[in-house]
Amino acid sequence: MSTTSHPTFYRRYVTDRHTLPLRARVGFTLAAVAALHLLAFGLLATALAPGAQPLALGVVLAAYAAGMKHSYDWDHISAIDNTTRKFVSEGMNPASVGFAFSLGHSLVVTLAGTMVVAGAQFVSGAFEDGSSANHVLGLIGAGVSGVYLLVLGLYNASISVGLARGRSTAHQHSAVGARGDGAADDGGWGLVSRLLRKPLQRVRRPREIFVLGFLFGLGFDTATTIGLLLLTVSASLAGVPALALLGLPVAFTAAMTLCDTLNGLGMMKLYSNALTQAGTRRRFNATVTVISAVSALFVATITLGGFFHDLLGLEDPATTALAEIDLGQAGLALIAVFALVWLRFWWVGRREPGTASST
């Protein structure tokens, strides 16, 4: 009996977990985020034991704050939002897009921080600004993120065109709600949508975003990476216990996964609701799809401009300007835009007859 129950359990809760009820998948995802927090602050607890270095509390909290700060970078927000939009348009309710992306993204700094704790001094040099390793990894990360966001942005732009044209008749309105956005694509950039579906078909489940997140992370923001590694080295020299030092990358990961998971779940709710109601919510669906597409194309342009500037050693004003743009915390502005759009349509929906009860 044990030989059959184990594969069944593995298939049910690992390979086929996308078939579980949404509430269960959300619960598993949030439980994983909670486990990361328990691990991070469990490691921190070793530094708070009698006679331990009190500096540990400050450095772990600093690492946690760095993880939260980095989760609101525009490329994070845009990648998670546009990927969520893709899955929802395919009839899925993706509960773990943000978690998988941030877990893969933070794995780079987690591995680097762990090697620093283990005494691998070459790691700090590899990430040093201007080093060959830093240059190559930065190009890989920028290339992957730029191309992925470009493809997603064009795909969602094609959906936006389809939605805009689909609003002309009641028949097309019902087709969007019944069959998802894919049916409406053919009314707009049908060829573009079909061409872009091919590469995007490789991303079939939210967990596959983990690999993309890791590749994005290879071009990790230099200041964030160096800052965390220097924090780890400094804390090590100050006598902070090794277990507490390991809490730094784990705390960084815990904070990033928390913020990105909540972002992914929030966008899933927004997009899913937009596809279930007529009138106001369908207009809301079209609006947020346009915002997602524009944000992805905007970030892709900046990222790829900087990529070609560094790869080819270009010195023209255009790519030089793009390479120098620091989006910083612009992701917070994008979240604010989505929130304002939602509030606007929520308010309008409450004022329209027959929509107050469903909003």
Regions found by a protein language model. Give the residues of each.
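Hydrophobic alpha-helical membrane-insertion segments
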Residues: 96-112, 251, 255, 287-304
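Juxtamembrane transmembrane-helix termini in multi-pass membrane transport proteins
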Residues: 43-128, 227-247, 269-274
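C-terminal regulatory/interaction regions
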Residues: 2-28, 233-243, 259, 263-359
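Alpha-helical multi-pass membrane helix bundles of inner-membrane/thylakoid proteins
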Residues: 57, 158-216, 276-283, 308-330, ...
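Divalent metal-coordination and catalytic microenvironments
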Residues: 37, 73, 105, 150, ...
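Membrane helix-loop-helix hairpins that form the core translocation module of multi-pass transporters
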Residues: 24-42, 96-184
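Small-residue-enriched transmembrane helix starts and helix-helix packing motifs
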Residues: 22-35, 41-72, 94-99, 191-219, ...
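Membrane-water interface of transmembrane alpha-helices
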Residues: 72, 76, 159-170, 258-273
